[in-house]
């Protein structure tokens, strides 16, 4: 376009091949067993967590490693915040 206002003479249409229209919808259906397998893959896996706390008798550091899921490690944390205490091997 030239000038401050567009006019029809300024517009040039270049017509080449018309793009092919493609259907993007997927009509594929899964068996129920495949859906269950896919659901199982997305569940959280068991993971190792290092826990460091203090002995309730002498105050020494007590270290342990647990394997559990994310929800279980939160439950363990809640137990430590409430009444669960660990005792070191020296005080046991």
UniProtKB/Swiss-Prot annotation:
Modification after translation (UniProt): Highly phosphorylated.
Keywords recorded for this protein, A-Z: Activator, DNA-binding, Early protein, G1/S host cell cycle checkpoint dysregulation by virus, Host cytoplasm, Host nucleus, Host-virus interaction, Inhibition of host innate immune response by virus, Inhibition of host interferon signaling pathway by virus, Interferon antiviral system evasion, Metal-binding, Modulation of host cell cycle by virus, Oncogene, Transcription, Transcription regulation, Viral immunoevasion, Zinc, Zinc-finger
A Gene Ontology biological process term: DNA-templated transcription
Function: Plays a role in viral genome replication by driving entry of quiescent cells into the cell cycle. Stimulation of progression from G1 to S phase allows the virus to efficiently use the cellular DNA replicating machinery to achieve viral genome replication. E7 protein has both transforming and trans-activating activities. Induces the disassembly of the E2F1 transcription factor from RB1, with subsequent transcriptional activation of E2F1-regulated S-phase genes. Interferes with host histone deacetylation mediated by HDAC1 and HDAC2, leading to transcription activation.
One of the record's GO cellular component terms: host cell cytoplasm
Residue intervals passing through the bilayer: none
Disulfide bonding pattern of the chain: none
Motif position, LXCXE motif: 24-28
The protein's name in its UniProt record: Protein E7
Family per record: Belongs to the papillomaviridae E7 protein family.
Location in or out of the cell: Host cytoplasm; Host nucleus
Keyword Metal-binding: yes
Domain remark text: The E7 terminal domain is an intrinsically disordered domain, whose flexibility and conformational transitions confer target adaptability to the oncoprotein. It allows adaptation to a variety of protein targets and exposes the PEST degradation sequence that regulates its turnover in the cell.
SUBUNIT field: Homodimer. Homooligomer. Interacts with host RB1; this interaction induces dissociation of RB1-E2F1 complex thereby disrupting RB1 activity. Interacts with host EP300; this interaction represses EP300 transcriptional activity. Interacts with protein E2; this interaction inhibits E7 oncogenic activity. Interacts with host TMEM173/STING; this interaction impairs the ability of TMEM173/STING to sense cytosolic DNA and promote the production of type I interferon (IFN-alpha and IFN-beta).
InterPro entries: Papilloma_E7
UniProt-annotated stretches for the region E7 terminal domain: 1-43
Sample GO molecular function, one term: DNA binding
